[in-house]
Amino acid sequence: MKDAKAVLKRFYEIVNEGATEKLDDVCAPDLKGHAGAGADLTQLKQSIASFREAFPDLRAEIRYAVAEDDLVSTWVSYQGTHQGEFAGVPGSGRNVKFVAWDLIRVEDGRIVEITQYCDVFTLMNQIGRFPPQHRPSKSICR
């Protein structure tokens, strides 16, 4: 799996499976993470596991992926059901849909660097973290 887009696709398949141990197949052991991805491979696995505990049916769908050399930029939509505690909010049974932007760098068929920005405001709004008067009327999710 040398192609950066193929590595990216496999990464999201693993996220959808919730099989964080399989990340070792597509991520370098010394992976560097930024923003929501955590600082390293261990933190990336923990982040994905935490999301999967709170949203067991979480699904990622790649909307756009643009590759240049060893970099792939993606716009990803996520959806799932809030069934477990997330950020101090107990499971609500609510369906959520939010988006994220990821930038990955691939070397020798493995992700060596990942940056992730997630629309946490929309997610928190959907699980009831904000009082109704502070909730926006529209979401940027499609």
Region spans (language model):
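C-terminal and inter-domain tail/linker signature
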Residues: 1-142
